[in-house]
């Protein structure tokens, strides 16, 4: 069946030296299958899969995607002993107040269109495919995150877009050590994922941060205007036709 084919493909990659990770989106309909899922992953891949934390994007605070209380949700899914799950719950609905370097140290690019933005949760501010001769805009989020919390912090925060925060490494989030000692990440990938972005990028001093903060209202206005035009051209104009 499809599940057998899935695990067969993952193991083929592993046998050829590729790094991999297997991740599950936990939802209430899977609760009765938890033991079976864990045992299947251990049998096929030597360890239980990592699990994320589901969110309800239809709610203002992006609440947990579950009918259970947070305490019940945590108790049920802790069985996977997942570093990803633990960290995502730890940062759940906690607003980031420190200066965030997403946008200057990171860039989210839609490979289908070229639309780009600092991270998943911010406004689009450019298209790097339409005008490849133009310099890429690298503007940090700073202290102006639009989201109630960093819902994909398992990637951005662990890589260090907010250097002041103590977090696991991205390798901790993605790797698993099997019962026989093998690991899902190769040494090279594990070493790369264990770094922090501050190791190889400029950390701004307070003077540079303050200068950026003074310019931010103008940057935001320009970004909002660009993002609105993108939405108009893609959605509203298309509907009118």
Regions found by a protein language model. Give the residues of each.
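Radical SAM enzyme [4Fe-4S]-AdoMet core and its adjacent flexible, acidic
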Residues: 1-117, 121, 126-130, 165-173
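Flexible mid-to-C-terminal extensions adjoining Fe-S/redox cofactors in radical SAM and related proteins
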Residues: 115-241
